[in-house]
């Protein structure tokens, strides 16, 4: 609706402009039709203009208008409560992020036309003004008035039709808005629709055009008003100018009104088009809502199907109730028979013995039930803690592997950038070599020019001596003019062919120079290019091998998850078998009751008990049977809950399997682009080997855990909260895997860009080599036989000319010596002569005094670090350690050089030196623990949480018993040889274990010792 209001505001602005223009035409019409008498009277008396709208002029006024426009999108968070699927778990709160448009108020300058008092007039009706202004306007003819009125009438009709269209459009929009309000309203869109911004932009440009047009019109109106108000006495000239201006104004006004009509029509069409698009979007939304309703109905059907298991559970419970009621009835019958028999018999000794036997049986049965309940609770708690530890450990390992891969990718990208910088440096060196060659060619040109200049100077100096030879040469030239002309034509032909040959030779030299620049002066770069091509082929082989490794890893991963799924199905079967075991327990109980019934029937003739004791025993038996029935119901309810939990676990594992298959598909897509990322795969190979070893260890640990879980899950009862936590953790892992896939995609895009650039460079090199080979073959194919003969003839003729010139220069042109001339004047002083040789070396001088101390020298470079081997380890206990023996700290925080073995709990010294060891052992509350720190199976230190205790006879007889502590701490420095072992043995007590470690064992190498030092 906001967009509709924007369109309406633009249409109203256009119509207001049209109305103002119409008002201008009215005003011009009324001011032009003035009576001749009135104008004549005004001219004679010097009074003001008399007309209907006298002293009024049209002005263009700008106004600032506020409008609401879109200013981006903002986000907000909304909580959503999701109910549990099977109705027994707590509500889950999900926070979703939504987007909504943000609007702002903007201001826009709009130009409008208003009627105001003309220049020199004021007052309410613009009647106050100077009396000196004369009206020199002439009344137009009737034909001109009629043509103007026809045009104005046409414009008014067009404006009225536009107003009708606007009113109809407003009615339609109002009706549509009412319909949408009845059908549920139309929510505000989250963002602007794709065509709205372009439409608004086009409307804005049209409004700017109209604004410029109104300004031009304003200027023309001001000129007209000035002419109207301040007219001079030249009436004919003013009439002609006024007529032309009037025609131009009317023509321009008509053109602009047509433009405004067309713009209004286009605006109306765009609004109708937008309205049609909105209707189509609403239909699509309705279809989407119907699809969502169908999906919702399907989910409801699934839920109703899943509730069928509850109906079966109700049937089973009702059957158990019937059985219990039948047993109660049989018990009542037996009690009645016992009462009858006891009334008939009077013997009481045997009755008491049977009563004691029955009580013993019942106590034994109660003790057995309590023991089984206690064992199941302990096993459930133990499996819960072990599952938590396993999931947290797996998540930590996945996180570390992801972070390591990200670091490796960053390092590889940095190496690629360094290689690109080296390539740029290599190209700059080639550019510098080209610049040096250009400088050398410039030097050669300058040398040639200087030689030519020197030749001209020498020839000019001997010009007087060679006049005779020149004359003789001229005679020879005249005599041989025809031969010279023929020779000239031949030379021209040879020069033309020589120029073409020279151009080819120059091109060939440029190509050869380019080849030299690429391959080097002696072919060293060519060898490098060959080695690069070989490396590319080798890298492609590495890519193929790594492709095989990735395929193997994917197969191993899919096999492991299939195995895990099969084991979970086996666990589910075991749970179903547990239900049968419970039914067997119930049948055993019924057998026990049957045996009791037989024994009671045997003893009916022998037992006689008092009625009070018998009633008490009967009440106890009733309570026991009720308790057994309740226990059976609770056990069956818990078993059904366990079944539902395992079904949900199977569903989540199926979802995880699908996500892993999707990730496998993504990996195959990455493998298809292996030609583009060959620069990174050489380092990924090592990482994949490491990851393969780690994954094998993880799968081994998973298999061991599954074996433990299979042995202990027979009587397990999983808690609801633990499952929720595990599911949330698994969802976090999936989210992290999604982020990892996104990071891999971005890295793949960047690498593909780099590799595509390198491939373009290789393609350019190949194209240049191909072009060079073509030019070389073209040069080899050129026939040079005729050119060679012509060049030989030319060289022979030039040699003959040179011989004649040499003979001419060798002639002696000197005449006889002349008379001696007069003595010349004394010359000026000459320059000083050269320096003479060095004299003998003098004796050595005395030793001078000691000078002041010099300045402090600069700081030298830092020295190398001492070669201190780094060795440390730290491990914690997260598994139960109930029995005595070597404590196996299974959770490793750090283990440099793999000196600590987490499977045996033993540290082996790899080098000789001094070592520091620290251990913190935490036991259960008020339970004494005792441990020994051993070096190579020899006790070094002993720890007792209860403190020192005297042995044997030294122990006092009467002493107060204090609550023992549950903490033992070791801090010790030991000299170890290479191969010595350190471990901690538990003597008595039981250590505490938790996900957050309570028992920790750490050690480190202080310094290494050599043999000569000891």
Curated annotation (Swiss-Prot):
Disruption phenotype: Morphants at 48 hpf display body curvature defects, impaired brain development, and motor neuron defects with abnormal development of axons and decreased arborization. Morphant embryos and larvae have decreased locomotor activity compared to wild-type.
Renumbered residue ranges of the record's region Disordered: 125-150, 811-869
A Gene Ontology biological process term: axon arborization
Superkingdom assignment: Eukaryota
Ranges annotated as biased composition (Basic and acidic residues): 134-150
Coiled coil location: 145-179
UniProt keyword terms in alphabetical order: Coiled coil, Disulfide bond, Extracellular matrix, Secreted, Signal
Record-annotated C1q domain positions: 866-1012
Signal peptide: 1-27
One cellular component (GO) term of this entry: extracellular region
S-S bonds: 57-118, 84-89, 117-126
PANTHER family referenced in this protein's UniProt entry, alphabetically: EMILIN ELASTIN MICROFIBRIL INTERFACE-LOCATED PROTEIN ELASTIN MICROFIBRIL INTERFACER, EMILIN-1
Function summary: May be responsible for anchoring smooth muscle cells to elastic fibers, and may be involved not only in the formation of the elastic fiber, but also in the processes that regulate vessel assembly. Has cell adhesive capacity.
Name of this protein: EMILIN-1-A
Taxonomic lineage: Eukaryota, Metazoa, Chordata, Craniata, Vertebrata
